[in-house]
C-alpha cells in the first residue's frame, strides 16, 4: 500500500513537470535569444532574410537611380558598365555587373567587418550606394564609349556627402566622390580615364592583369578603323597618347601573357608603365611586390584597375581571356591590403563573364576583391587639410 502511494506521488510530480516544461523551455529560449542579440553586432534575421529577397545590389547596399536623380549625395558609388564588344576572345562580360552583385550578397551578412584591414566599410563615415548600370548601346562602340565617359563623369563630379568643405585633389581643388565600376570588358577603362582626367588631370595607374593592354592598335586587332582600334588590349596605349596617365608612375602587376615580341615591353615603357610579372611572386614574394607598387605610385592620387584574369583560372575561370599560372585569390587580396593608405580616386573590376563560371567561383572572388578596395577607400579619404574654394563641379 505504501509502495502504491509512492508511485502515485511520483506520477503526479512527473505530470506537473511535464506541464511546466514548455513554459520553462520557452523562457530559456527567450533568454538565450535576447542574450545572443545583445552580445553580437549586425541585425540578425533581418539581414539574413534580405540575402534572398529584393533586387541584388553590391553587398546589399541601397540602390539609387543616381544618373536620373541628382538630389542624392554619396561618397562612394558602385556603377555598372555592361559593355563587352571590345573583346578579342570570349564575350560575356556585359553580364559582369549583375554577376558580381549576385556574388556579393553575403558580404554584409554578419556586419561586414574586414578583420585584416581592421575596418567596416559598410558601417563607417562613407555613404556608399549602388547606382545601377549605365544605359549602353550594344550596337555602336563609339556611342557606348561616350556613354560610359558621360555616365561616369556625371557621378564623379557630384558633391560628396562627406568632406565637401575640405580641400581636394580635383583640378578646381574640390573633394569628389569615388566611383567603383563593375565591368564590362577592359575597354571601359579608356572612357573612365577620360572622365577622371577631366576632373583630376593625369593620374597614376595601378593595374592588375595577366595582359599588358598597352599594345599599339596595329599589333592588337590591326587598327582597321579608329573605332576598331579601341579595344580591351589597346586602351592604355590610347590613354597614354591622350595624356590621361601620369608619366612613369604607372605599374602593371600579375603579367604573364605572350607577346608579339620584346618590342611590346618597349612600347609599354613608352606608355609610362613598370611591369611586375606573375612569376615574380615566387622569387621576391608578396611584400616586395607591395613595395614596388607603392614606390612606383608614390604619394599622389591613383586609379586602380583590376582584370579578374590576374587570378589563375582555377580561382577565376569565368573570364574572356584566361591565362594559366596566375595568382591565387588569397595572394591578390593580401597584395591589395598592402596598398592601404594609397589615395585611390576610383577603381574598377572587369572581364567577369559569368556564363563561364561554376558555383559562382569567379563572381564571389570579384566581390571579395572589391570588398578590399572598399576598405582601402574608406580608410583613406582623398582630401587635403586646407580649407577649399567653391567647386566649379557643384
From Swiss-Prot:
Annotated Mn(2+) 1 binding lies at: 186, 209, 213, 307
Known cofactor(s): Mn(2+)
Give GO cellular component annotations, separated by semicolons.
Answer: endoplasmic reticulum
Q: For this UniProt entry, which residues form the secretion signal?
A: 1-20
Which reaction does this chain catalyze?
agmatine + H2O = urea + putrescine
EC code: 3.5.3.11
Q: Which InterPro entries match?
A: Ureohydrolase (IPR006035), Ureohydrolase_dom_sf (IPR023696), Ureohydrolase_Mn_BS (IPR020855)
Residues annotated to bind Mn(2+) 2 = 209, 211, 307, 309
Q: Specify the superkingdom.
A: Eukaryota
User: What are the alphabetically sorted keywords of the record?
Assistant: Hydrolase, Manganese, Metal-binding, Signal
The record's section on Pfam families has:
Arginase
GO MF, one annotated term: metal ion binding
What's its top-level EC category? hydrolase
* One Gene Ontology biological process: urea metabolic process
What is the similarity comment for this entry?
Belongs to the arginase family.
Q: What is this protein called?
A: Putative agmatinase 1
Species per Swiss-Prot/TrEMBL record: Schizosaccharomyces pombe (strain 972 / ATCC 24843)
Amino acid at each position: 500500500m505504501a509502495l502504491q502511494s509512492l508511485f502515485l506521488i511520483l506520477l503526479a510530480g512527473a505530470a506537473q513537470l511535464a506541464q511546466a516544461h514548455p513554459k520553462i523551455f520557452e523562457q530559456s529560449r527567450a533568454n538565450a535569444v535576447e542574450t545572443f542579440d545583445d552580445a553580437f553586432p549586425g541585425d540578425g534575421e533581418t539581414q539574413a532574410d534580405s540575402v534572398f529577397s529584393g533586387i541584388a545590389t553590391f553587398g546589399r547596399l541601397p540602390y539609387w537611380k543616381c544618373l536620373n536623380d541628382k538630389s542624392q549625395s554619396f561618397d562612394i558609388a558602385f556603377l555598372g558598365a555592361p559593355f563587352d564588344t571590345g573583346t578579342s576572345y570570349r564575350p560575356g562580360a556585359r553580364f559582369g555587373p549583375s554577376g558580381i552583385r549576385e556574388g556579393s550578397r553575403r558580404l554584409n551578412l554578419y556586419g561586414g567587418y574586414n578583420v585584416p584591414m581592421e575596418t567596416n566599410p559598410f558601417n563607417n563615415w562613407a555613404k556608399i550606394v549602388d547606382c545601377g548600370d549605365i544605359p549602353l548601346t550594344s550596337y555602336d562602340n563609339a556611342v557606348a564609349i561616350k556613354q560610359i565617359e558621360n555616365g561616369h563623369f556625371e557621378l564623379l563630379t557630384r558633391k560628396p556627402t562627406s568632406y565637401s568643405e575640405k580641400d581636394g585633389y580635383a583640378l578646381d581643388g574640390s573633394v569628389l566622390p569615388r566611383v567603383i565600376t563593375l565591368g564590362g570588358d577592359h575597354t571601359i577603362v579608356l572612357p573612365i580615364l577620360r572622365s577622371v582626367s577631366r576632373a583630376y588631370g593625369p593620374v597614376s595607374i595601378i593595374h592588375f592583369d595577366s595582359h599588358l593592354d598597352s599594345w599599339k592598335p596595329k599589333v592588337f586587332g590591326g587598327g582597321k578603323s579608329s573605332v576598331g582600334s579601341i579595344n580591351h588590349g589597346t586602351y592604355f596605349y590610347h590613354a597614354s597618347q591622350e595624356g590621361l596617365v601620369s608619366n612613369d608612375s604607372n605599374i602593371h602587376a600579375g603579367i604573364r601573357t605572350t607577346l608579339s615580341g620584346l618590342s611590346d615591353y618597349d612600347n609599354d615603357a613608352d606608355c609610362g608603365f613598370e611591369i611586375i610579372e606573375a612569376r615574380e611572386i615566387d622569387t621576391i614574394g608578396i611584400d616586395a611586390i607591395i613595395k614596388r607598387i607603392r614606390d612606383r605610385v608614390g604619394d599622389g592620387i591613383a586609379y586602380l584597375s583590376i582584370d579578374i584574369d590576374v587570378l589563375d583560372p582555377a580561382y577565376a575561370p569565368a573570364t574572356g581571356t584566361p591565362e594559366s599560372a596566375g595568382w591565387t585569390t588569397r595572394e591578390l587580396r593580401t597584395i591589395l591590403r598592402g596598398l592601404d593608405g594609397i589615395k585611390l580616386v576610383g577603381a574598377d573590376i572587369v572581364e567577369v563573364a559569368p556564363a563561364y563560371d561554376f558555383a559562382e567561383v569567379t563572381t564571389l572572388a570579384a566581390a571579395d576583391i572589391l570588398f578590399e578596395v572598399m576598405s582601402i577607400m574608406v580608410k583613406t579619404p582623398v582630401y587635403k587639410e586646407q580649407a577649399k574654394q567653391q567647386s566649379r563641379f557643384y
